[in-house]
Amino acid sequence: MPPSLRKAVAAAIGGGAIAIASVLITGPSGNDGLEGVSYIPYKDIVGVWTVCHGHTGKDIMLGKTYTKAECKALLNKDLATVARQINPYIKVDIPETMRGALYSLLYNVGAGNFRTSTLLRKINQGDIKGACDQLRRWTYAGGKQWKGLMTRREIEREICLWGQQ
């Protein structure tokens, strides 16, 4: 993980899991995190219309140029949605750094498969390291493994494990 990202994530810990995930996604300067930024909608590697830091959905307006403030608002809304989708399934106390890493992961891949995942099962069994190691399995898009996703998952795993230290 780049030292600047490590420092920014450490500074965000007091803000909670959503703040941690936001810094992971946007990076210290707002465009150098795990997600790139595009103010103009584009199709991602699996053909989904995407804008800003990875926002997807029917509310994307093709042809519109989004502002930095609009992108921040979309990210905050999306991370709050991720939190609502997964928090009810986590039955044990986990560190905020782990929760932030999970929010980042599920912002990227969607929360659908989380409910039946080995990742969640390991969390609820109290196997924090085993759960964090599961992040390495979420590296496929469109049936293909991607180096960029492998790198991202290693960074998320590192943050996930911070609560162990």
Swiss-Prot record:
Gene3D superfamilies membership: 1.10.530.40
Keywords for this protein: Antimicrobial, Bacteriolytic enzyme, Cytolysis, Glycosidase, Host cell inner membrane, Host cell lysis by virus, Host cell membrane, Host membrane, Hydrolase, Membrane, Signal-anchor, Transmembrane, Transmembrane helix, Viral release from host cell
Domain-related comment: The signal-anchor, which may also be an uncleaved signal sequence tethers the SAR-endolysin to the membrane until the latter is depolarized by the holin, resulting in the escape of SAR-endolysin from the membrane.
E.C. numbers: 3.2.1.17
Subcellular location per the Swiss-Prot or TrEMBL entry: Host cell inner membrane
Family recorded in the similarity comment: Belongs to the glycosyl hydrolase 24 family.
Keyword hit for Acyltransferase: no
Catalytic activity: Hydrolysis of (1->4)-beta-linkages between N-acetylmuramic acid and N-acetyl-D-glucosamine residues in a peptidoglycan and between N-acetyl-D-glucosamine residues in chitodextrins
GO BP: any one term: cell wall macromolecule catabolic process
Chief localization: host cell
Gene that this sequence comes from: R
Pfam families: Phage_lysozyme
Function: Signal-arrest-release (SAR) endolysin with lysozyme activity that degrades host peptidoglycans and participates with the pinholin and spanin proteins in the sequential events which lead to programmed host cell lysis releasing the mature viral particles. Once the pinholin has permeabilized the host cell membrane, the SAR-endolysin is released into the periplasm where it breaks down the peptidoglycan layer.
Enzyme class: hydrolase
Organism: Enterobacteria phage P21 (Bacteriophage 21)
A single Gene Ontology CC term: membrane
Keyword Ubl conjugation: no
Any GO MF annotation of the entry: lysozyme activity
Transmembrane intervals: 8-28
Protein name as it appears in the record: SAR-endolysin
InterPro entries in alphabetical order: Bacteriophage_GH24 (IPR051018), Endolysin_T4_type (IPR034690), Glyco_hydro_24 (IPR002196), Lysozyme-like_dom_sf (IPR023346), Lysozyme_dom_sf (IPR023347), SAR_endolysin-like (IPR043688)
Membrane topology field: Single-pass type II membrane protein
Active site residues of this protein: E35, D44
